[in-house]
Amino acid sequence: MTLPGRCPGPRSIFGTMKALAPTSEAELAEMVASASEPLRIMGGGTRPIGVPVNGQPLTTSRLTGVTLYEPGALTLVVQAGTPVEEVRKTLAAEGQRLAFEPMDHRGLLGTTGEPTIGGVFAANVSGPRRIQAGAARDFLLGVRFVDGQGQVTRNGGRVMKNVTGYDLVKLMAGSYGTLGVLTELALKVLPASHHTATITLSGLDDTTAVAALSRALGSPFEITGAAHRQTADGPQTCLRIEGFEKSVAYRAGQIQTLLADLGAAKVETDPDTNTTLWQDIRDVACFHDGEGDIWRLSVKPSDAPGIKAQVDGAEALYDWGGGLVWLRVPQNTHADTIRAAVNAAGGHATLIRGNRAGGAFQPLSPPIAALQDGLRARFDPRGILNPGLMGRAA
Amino acid sequence: MDMPKPNPTILARKSQLLDRLASFLPREALIHDPSETRAYECDGLTAYKCPPLAVVLPASTAEVSETLRICNDMGVPVVPRGAGTSLAGGALPTEDSVIIGVARMTEVLETDYDNRFIRVQTGRTNLSVTGAVEEDGFFYAPDPSSQLACAIAGNIAMNSGGAHCLKYGVTTNNLMGVTMVLMDGTVTEIGGAHLDAEGLDLLGLICGSEGQLGIVTEATLRILHKPEGARPVLIGYDSSEIAGQCVSDIIKAGVLPVAIEFMDRPCIRATEAFAGAGYPDCEALLIVEVEGSDAEIDEQLETIMDIARKHDPVELRQSSSEDESKRIWLGRKSAFGAMGKINDYMCLDGTIPVNELPYVLKRIGEMSKEYGLDVANVFHAGDGNMHPLILFDANKEGDLELCEELGAEILKLCVEVGGCLTGEHGVGIEKRDLMLHQYDPPDLEIQMAVKDVFDPKWLLNPAKVFPLASSDTRRIAAE
């Protein structure tokens, strides 16, 4: 028998403890207000990033449904626990999409369950199109959330331009449930593209590849994906162009001319092949199988190959023109090795898969850490929302 | 407009404060003579004026830090100032405050085309950021209409937008990193040349916080290569409802123009008399601009014009030359100036859901009649950011108050239909007391809690953003 408001969650995430699963915002607020122990806040539990939280699981997965969808205004209001797949289908029916292309972490992290839209924003998850369209946080227009005292709060709205008061919408995006539990989100959506082409160069070393990506991204031809990866056939450097048919053909031609000195390029225009290719890059498919710790680095693109070269035994997938590096390193590679390389250049590194006992998120400078701790203490004075995540001591 | 009473203790300690500031600032960086501080008594919202105690114009982050440390130590309020172009009173001083202006900090610190960013001191004007990279084909996207004068510091404080943000986003979407000095003088670095700064999104929080959390002295900004070309099309309709429908259909069709601008008849007539752009005399005019190569522009404009034709336009004119494009934009860009020629006006900045456009325009028309004040509309239709201009006579007793009352009613209407009080100008003092129409007390409480963390004594940019009554206890407790 399942108790009301509770559901058995996937074993790997929820452990043996039954998760609290409120079916309304009011019920969620009451649960947080009356909580006497730390809460482990989650959506579908498919993205266990950071040091595992020792606490009573609370999932938003039963807060579901689209509240409002105005295709002509490019806006969608949705409950936080709504599956990403449901959002995708709703938008696709009107020829629209989540332009920031959120990654699905299940393959990389070996998790099961249903990714939720709230989880996407709580972790600010963006895919290859982030370089052109923006990150998840750039598409979040408004939020409702329950803070650490059980107070329901809202910020932002459902319009594109809004500077009314402080932008807590951005603050909530990527806060991993440490400031509040998201209950409802207003999003900006965009039209899906009619056509896609991918221009692929083969055999480039990392440095040449990132330089090629930079050259293309610094052109007027609106690249929406820029990645460099290792395949069974050797290294591939991929550039994506999207839009109306003639425009895509024109820009694909221009990019080939621009990069003609780097060898013959292959142009792929088949929609399904393109979808698979960019989904593989988005979800880091190349590292799904096999051992090894996975690190996610955000760096200045031209620094990326040098940072990778400093880590023994590292393999890399470069996205965002080199600015996003997925590193697979031998198991238990010391965090200091990677952090030292990243810190010297500037940027940040997060341990996504592997032993996270020593911390997963980038350590912050003392003044920034003080601000972050101060904000958490205000939003969650009792320290019950995901304690230990994002650096603050449990 | 109520402002907090000046603190007599601070006024009495003026000479001590000036001594401490003069101990490390060069003479030209410290202004305290009343004849000179008067230049700083207001910003673009000229209806309200108050000279500050002193003005500091630092040349470096270190000087900003030292000034803040001293003011914090002595409990002196600080009003950060960019170029002073705020239309919301965001840089209005109080009598007991020190203005810290970044006007002397205008250097380009680093330009990196491979990684597509520029790092500047924040006193640099918006347009001169683009100016620093345009010879190499690049530009900085946010383009507020004050871009010739406004500073990046103010753009960050107000999260400024512009006509082209439908495609390129506003300041927050183009800001990669900052050097920011906290009220106690601590210098912080957030983000940089990489995407998505680590930790909580403090960059997103600072952007649009109206100078109440810290003073941003340096900024890393995303730059983009300029498009190959751009061309507008002019579409005229005999009803604003149909124009609104056309906007919605264009967006739904999957074309993403860089700009969709809307002007109504009063605005068209005023602009036409002023700039002679050749606009038709109709109820609603749309300027839709797309970018790309010539062929790409043709392809997009074809789709847009097909949609426009379905709604039976009274005018449909595609620009055929660079000169014609310029003229089309000249009308729009001189709209505010044109209105200013014929009248005093107040410019509002509410945003509404795009689909509410016809209803809101109809209601504004009715309210305009009720109040007996003309309202002209010119705005960014693609994103619902309205700029109703209320015409009034500053020399006529009671007209300003009547105008402000109508303005408040229009903004409340924006909120009622699901929009907000301000889309790009900021709250400042102008919309401060309307905040409770947008937010409930707990929503404001948590925003004020953010300020508690960054500025525990509530000294930075006093009396802005929050209704005075809501923030009273905090300011008094800090004194």
Where are the language model's segments positioned?
Chain B
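Noncatalytic alpha-helical scaffold of FAD-dependent oxidoreductases
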Residues: 1-479
